[in-house]
Regions:
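Extended, hydrophobic/aromatic-rich amphipathic alpha-helical segments that build helical scaffolds
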Residues: 79-80, 87-91, 144, 166-169, ...
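Bacterial Sec-dependent N-terminal signal peptides
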Residues: 1-27
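Alpha-helical support elements that line or immediately flank enzyme active sites
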Residues: 76-117, 353-365, 420-432
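Long, repeat-rich segments with strong aromatic
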Residues: 277-304, 409-432
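Extended, well-ordered alpha-helical scaffold segments
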Residues: 32, 95-117, 157-176, 293, ...
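Aromatic/His-enriched, Gly/Pro-containing loop or helix-boundary segments
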Residues: 120-164
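Extended glycan-interaction surfaces of carbohydrate-active proteins
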Residues: 28-73, 112-131, 185-281, 322-415, ...
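Core register positions within helices of long alpha-helical scaffolds
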Residues: 85, 147, 293, 300, ...
Length: 507
């Protein structure tokens, strides 16, 4: 094969062109000015409970700017990506030298955001979907540990770290008590465990604690959002029943509504990824983020000099790592997948969560791992982002009959900033060490993904003067699948944008 036809050679050539393009386009990242002028307009402050709102002790960041009627709450997993932008801005003085007042305020706001999440854990035992009482029947992907890492790396405040780790332990306990399932001896066979480690032999899934009255109301909401295709399946399932708690018969349509409410906890509301069986799936991203939680507790208590606790969390994180490598990993593809807890087998749905093991730095750093990751990028990354799920027409590895016939926004062709970020950081983690060529390819792909993200954001900002919730993975435009009228956004779109703009072109 001639080098001009080789995708690898083209990517190597691209890395040279990339550095040239970064220098040439430095002046073109004009949306940074919009971010600087407007980030504070996304901050609200409601210290007291008010109607459905849960009062928070500090000002908190929301996904939208003042005046927008949607997303006025503080959302759990959104906050991680919002903080990435605040921290990038707050620690990269625009004119060199000392940070100015606004930059210092951005850093302080990031700390306020995490302190608010810690407050919610101490109040409720976990972080809810958002600071509304009506959203306390579910959480969102557990990124508190990642946020604690980000803050402590900058402040080195050990007193704050001790407080944060205490809350993180409580949150971890909640996930293990409320969102986990025991494994069979055959599933953990071969994994080294200690005398008191049997309680850790569990995998986690997304779920909810809604009662039937809430699920009935939620099903009506789904009818309006997802359309007649949802209604058809819901009504058909309601012709049958299942035996629930206390031996009571319940219509099967409620189980469908419950699965979709659990998708809301995953953050992927809604998607074909779980095939409307979310509670039956040990989600790869969830278990990877809980591994990161355990690793944060292990390393955090080591920093604080508490060796006993550190060793305990190190052991727990190693057990989870072994479980993920044993049950979620497929040696034939070299990739990690979701795990079906009802069928006790891999759930083969090609999706962007497959980059999460690399985001949390779980797999080994060797050539085999890196070449498999290169192959995954070829399959899952589009021109302007990462496919949430591949269309079934090209997902040749899928082994399921799709029962999700309604429109879903966490699917092709939508590109979501959180998934882009997880992928970029995962590739960066493995763009070093053994294997020069695959490492180089991962580095180039990471930079290409950042640049295409910036290009997409800048292109639409030039046309509209706004950031948006999601973009088209193929065109970089706003021709996306919506489950509701897409609002102009700030939140994770602006946060990821600001981090990449400052990382690639500097202050």
């Amino acid at each position: 094969m001639r080098w001009q036809q080789s995708k690898w050679a083209k990517r190597v050539l691209f890395t040279v062109l990339l550095h040239f393009s970064i220098n040439c386009c430095q002046a073109q990242f004009v949306a940074t000015t919009h971010y600087i002028k407007n980030w504070s307009r996304s901050v609200r402050y409601t210290p007291n409970d008010s109607a459905d709102f849960i009062g928070l002790p500090h000002p908190y960041s929301t996904p939208t700017l003042a005046g927008n009627k949607l997303f006025q709450e503080m959302y759990y997993w959104d906050t991680y990506f919002i903080n990435r932008g605040l921290l990038a801005y707050g620690t990269h003085p625009q004119r060199g030298g000392e940070a100015n007042v606004d930059e210092k305020l951005a850093l302080q706001q990031a700390i306020h955001n995490v302190d608010n999440l810690i407050f919610l854990v101490n109040k409720l035992g976990f972080v809810p979907n958002a600071n509304r009482y009506s959203m306390t029947n579910r959480s969102q992907p557990p990124l508190l540990g990642a946020m604690i890492n980000d803050i402590y790396t900058i402040t080195k405040d050990t007193a704050w770290l001790r407080k944060a780790l205490s809350a993180l332990e409580k949150e971890h306990h909640w996930w293990m008590e409320n969102r986990s399932l025991n494994l069979s001896p055959s599933e953990y066979a071969g994994i080294k465990i200690g005398k008191y480690d049997t309680a850790t032999l569990r995998l986690n899934h997304y779920g909810n604690s809604a009662d039937d009255a809430f699920l009935i109301r939620f099903s009506k909401f789904l009818s309006g959002r997802l359309g007649p295709e949802f209604d058809s399946l819901y009504l058909r399932l309601n012709l049958d029943s299942f035996v629930g708690g206390y031996g009571q018969k319940r219509p099967k349509g409620l189980r469908l509504a419950s699965h979709l409410l659990s998708e809301a906890e995953s953050g992927w509301d809604f998607t074909t990824r779980f095939n409307a069986r979310c509670e039956n799936i040990a989600a790869l991203d969830l278990n990877c983020l809980l591994y990161l939680t355990e690793k944060t507790l292990w390393e955090g208590y080591k920093t604080l000099g508490d060796q006993k606790k550190s060793n305990s969390w190190k052991r727990r994180s190693n057990i989870r790592k072994s479980l993920i490598n044993k049950l979620f990993y497929d040696k034939h593809t070299g990739w990690y997948w979701d795990y079906d807890l009802s069928k006790r087998e891999i759930h083969r749905s090609s999706n962007a969560a497959q980059f999460l093991p690399y985001f949390v730095d779980l797999p080994k750093h060797n050539k085999q791992t890196k070449w498999a990751l290169v192959a995954l990028t070829n399959k899952q990354i589009g021109e302007y982002g990462v496919y949430p799920c591949l269309p079934q027409s090209i997902d040749t590895l899928g082994n399921r009959e799709n029962r999700v016939l309604w429109k879903t926004q966490w699917d092709s062709p939508n590109a979501w900033p959180p998934l882009t970020h997880f992928t970029v950081k995962g590739l960066e983690n493995y763009a070093r060490g053994p294997g020069k060529l695959p490492s180089l390819l991962l580095h180039v792909t990471s930079n290409r993904l950042m640049m295409s993200y910036l290009e997409s954001i800048e292109g639409q900002f030039a046309l509209t003067g706004k950031f948006w919730e999601k973009y088209n993975v193929k065109t970089g435009g706003l021709d996306v699948i919506n489950e509701y009228p897409m609002p102009d956004f700030f939140g994770w779109t602006a946060g990821v944008y600001m981090e990449y703009a400052l990382e690639l072109v500097g202050p």
